[in-house]
């Protein structure tokens, strides 16, 4: 059976490198499922979870919190260059919960001062924290 090589790379280095038979990511246009022999493609990624179904007998599923970036698909090699990425097993949930609370406070404070840029920045931080929390529960 044909499989793809999946690599997730961040400024901190390679976070994931395995073979897979299915990948699910989220782009600005919505969720995208990727199977082997997919057409070549480059697309931006949203802050969202990434699902990777590995090949083999155990059909293991890996989950990664992707916090923006791009995906490139070429010749059964899927490369994701992400701003940051964490596997479900590596997420510090208490840290993510603290980040969520901090972002919620920053949103409330920025809204009272009508600081639109700060509201946007805090909402991105909130999405990232919620993404990490959701992936940690998979």
From Swiss-Prot:
CDD domains: F1-ATPase_delta. The keyword Transport applies. GO terms for cellular component: plasma membrane; proton-transporting ATP synthase complex. It is found in: Cell membrane. It is a peripheral membrane protein. One of its GO terms (molecular function) is proton-transporting ATP synthase activity, rotational mechanism. The keyword Protease does not apply. InterPro entries: ATP_synth_F1_dsu/esu, ATP_synth_F1_dsu/esu_N, ATP_synth_F1_esu_C, ATPsynth_dsu/esu_N. Keywords: ATP synthesis, Cell membrane, CF(1), Hydrogen ion transport, Ion transport, Membrane, Transport. Pfam families: ATP-synt_DE (PF00401), ATP-synt_DE_N (PF02823). Produces ATP from ADP in the presence of a proton gradient across the membrane. F-type ATPases have 2 components, CF(1) - the catalytic core - and CF(0) - the membrane proton channel. CF(1) has five subunits: alpha(3), beta(3), gamma(1), delta(1), epsilon(1). CF(0) has three main subunits: a, b and c. NCBIfam families: ATP_synt_epsi, PRK00571.1-3. Belongs to the ATPase epsilon chain family. PANTHER family: ATP SYNTHASE DELTA/EPSILON CHAIN, ATP SYNTHASE EPSILON CHAIN, CHLOROPLASTIC. This is ATP synthase epsilon chain. It comes from Streptococcus pyogenes serotype M1.
């Amino acid at each position: 059976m044909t499989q793809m090589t999946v690599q997730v790379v961040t400024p901190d280095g390679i976070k994931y490198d395995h073979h897979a038979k299915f990948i699910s990511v989220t782009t600005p246009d919505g969720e995208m499922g990727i199977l082997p022999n997919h057409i070549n493609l480059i697309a931006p990624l949203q802050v969202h979870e990434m699902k990777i179904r590995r090949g083999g007998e155990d059909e293991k599923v890996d989950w990664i919190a992707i916090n923006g970036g791009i995906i490139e698909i070429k010749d059964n090699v899927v490369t994701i260059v992400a701003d940051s990425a964490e596997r479900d097993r590596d997420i510090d949930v208490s840290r993510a919960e603290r980040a969520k609370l901090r972002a919620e406070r920053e949103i409330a404070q920025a809204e009272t001062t009508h600081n639109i840029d700060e509201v946007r920045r805090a909402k991105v931080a909130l999405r990232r924290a919620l993404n990490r929390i959701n992936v940690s529960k998979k």
